[in-house]
Amino acid sequence: MGSCQAGHYLHFCLAHHPPLVCATLILLLLGLSGLGLGGFLLTHRTDLRSPDIPQDWVSFLRSFGQLTLCPVNGTVTGKGRGSHIVGLLTTLNFGDGPDRNKTQTFQAQVQGSRMGLKGSFARELVLVTARVTTERTPGTCLYFSAIPEILPSSQPPIPCSEEGAGNATLSPRMSEECVGVWSHEGLVLTKLLTSEELTLCGSRLLVLGFFLILFCGLCCLTAACFHPRRESHWSRTRL
């Protein structure tokens, strides 16, 4: 009896207020999705990327334009005088080449004028180093060696250790072994959400999901209370 009455209410609302029913169903689905996603974030500590990337790092990478990284000779030495080294993780992928089984080092030197810098900074050099290791880790660490005034002031989204960064001479190998990368396509920054951010996000999604489901329940209860009662068979016969 209750299921028939609920079906009658739903049929009546669909016939007379279809936009209201569709909006309620959409809110109900959003609430259920919020509960599911919030519970997943609180129970599973997965690595999720954050869209909040420091803009000075985005502008710094875009200023390189097309970057050509070439293999280097020998071991990488220490950094130059007055230089500062910053390493960060990017989505740059060098693929599976013939030398993929050994650690490779690629470098490029970029002058400040090419990056759009003016004045005395235009003559400064920025050394970009990429170390491709044999470990199957996502992304590649890039190291930037330059004076502190040129490098971004904020912390890298995902920093890398300074191991493997510094100065070296470009190898006189064939130019085909160099890797050309457009900075606005290949050097995409990655930043993972911390455990505190995951907890905050999951709890807010749970609260939002509960609120939406409660709101949908109140809407259904209001519609059931103000719905005109169906006349019984005996009352129609009496009339």
UniProtKB/Swiss-Prot annotation:
Major place of residence: membrane
Where would one find the signal peptide in this protein? 1-38
Q: Which domain of life is it from?
A: Eukaryota
Tell me how this protein sits in the membrane. Single-pass membrane protein
Q: Name one GO biological process term.
A: apoptotic process
- Gene Ontology cellular-component annotations: plasma membrane
| Pfam families associated with the record | TMEM219
* Extracellular face residues: 39-205
Cite the InterPro entries for this sequence. Answer: TMEM248/TMEM219 (IPR039493), TMEM248/TMEM219_dom (IPR039587)
Entry's transmembrane regions: 206-226
Q: Does the keyword Signal apply?
A: yes
Which residue spans belong to the Cytoplasmic compartment?
227-239
Query: Is Transmembrane helix among the key words of this record?
Result: yes
Q: Which UniProt keywords apply?
A: Apoptosis, Cell membrane, Glycoprotein, Membrane, Receptor, Signal, Transmembrane, Transmembrane helix
Instruction: Give the record's glycosylation annotations as residue positions.
Output: 101, 167
Q: Which PANTHER family match?
A: INSULIN-LIKE GROWTH FACTOR-BINDING PROTEIN 3 RECEPTOR, TRANSMEMBRANE PROTEIN 248-LIKE
> Briefly, what is this protein's role?
Cell death receptor specific for IGFBP3, may mediate caspase-8-dependent apoptosis upon ligand binding.
Q: What is this protein called?
A: Insulin-like growth factor-binding protein 3 receptor
Gene name linked to the record: TMEM219
